[in-house]
Amino acid sequence: MEEVIKVSDLTRKYKDFSLGPVDLSFPKGFATALIGANGAGKTTLMDIICGITAKTGGTVTYFGETDNPDKGNIKERIGYCASQAMFPANWKVRDIALSMSLAFDKFSKDRFYSLLGELGVTDEKNSKKPLSSMSDGMKMRVFLASAFARDTDLLVLDEPGSSLDPLMRDRLCDRFRDYIDSGNGERSII
């Protein structure tokens, strides 16, 4: 089975925490969940995969090619949604749309706003609020829309349903299926 990400002997050491060594792979064309106790290192692992946090040792192979998330078009191929603040607290929806369109070639503002509509964020009241005044669930909807509005091969989502109500979690599961199905076996979710 082809792998979208392969992690070998991966370690990350902090003062009070050590991750690894970790050896695992994520298959292409599937949604794979990382399950573990709070504080086990799931977020750290995802941050390393996305190039947000540096690894102490080991390798991460992306799409069978490289161990460097900054090389080539790797960052264009990976969409990321954190469980915490991804953008400055004073930003509004329009600021996020602008920054994402400048940062990523394959970000669609039209798709972003359409997804916000599906997720119930585009009413006048919510779309003009700064992130700091949105509920956690509303912020997560904005973060998810920003990730799904990019044309990527891999989505890395950190606890995407944790702050969503049951209806929004159902919509999120539908979005996962649509994303995987639209990739003809080439798209994956972690």
Regions found by a protein language model. Give the residues of each.
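Helix N-cap at the start of a conserved alpha-helix in ABC-type nucleotide-binding domains
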Residues: 166-168
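Conserved ABC transporter NBD signature motif
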Residues: 58-74
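ABC-family P-loop ATPase nucleotide-binding domains
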Residues: 83-142
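Helix-to-loop junction immediately C-terminal to a conserved catalytic motif
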Residues: 50
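Catalytic Walker B motif of ABC-type/P-loop ATPase nucleotide-binding domains
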Residues: 155-159
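The feature captures the beta-strand-to-loop junction immediately N-terminal to the Walker
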Residues: 35-37
